[in-house]
């Protein structure tokens, strides 16, 4: 355990050093809206808020959609960098809720309490698959999102996304990792649901060698307003990749038409979440 923690600390120190080495994003670089950042309790312990904010700034991440297990991490990072952080509420009190939250009554109480105390733009990111979307606790979560005017950030298969829309046809959903689906399936879902947007976090199949792969390129050009990039710092060590992910994203985005690249890099995130957060203040 101590050895693993030591490795994590070294990696996180490397994250800050790498970010500083890159320096602020050059004018020619695209700003990045990172739509998939977590700052959970173990990350807070290993990378204090001031250092985490420095990683984001030096990587040229001008805005980040942040959720955490538990929410205290998000609130600490928001207090440190309010010009960057846009908060969403993850329905997890601890990491243990990742797999069992859909059947844990205490999750509802937790979400209700946090919504009364703080402001958010979305509920998520949450893990939800298939028919579990129709269980009472996920249904209550959807009701709360509707009540508070929040988006849903779903780490879900297409089936669960469909079930969420059946419960709330007007829902606005950010589909985490684009469901890890192939581009043709993502296309089907985007065509069917005009309020569905997709993040590309924790996947690399959409680009290689500094260029989008052909099927994904077609999809990005067909739906330029519906995609966002994201790192997914689901464990503390992933913070090491925030600068590298931003750099890698800029490389393949620059192969797209400039207006499309700008939308996916940061304008879509600003239009969807930046605008929503401005209304909450």
Each model region followed by its residue ranges:
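Bacterial N-terminal signal peptides
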Residues: 7-21
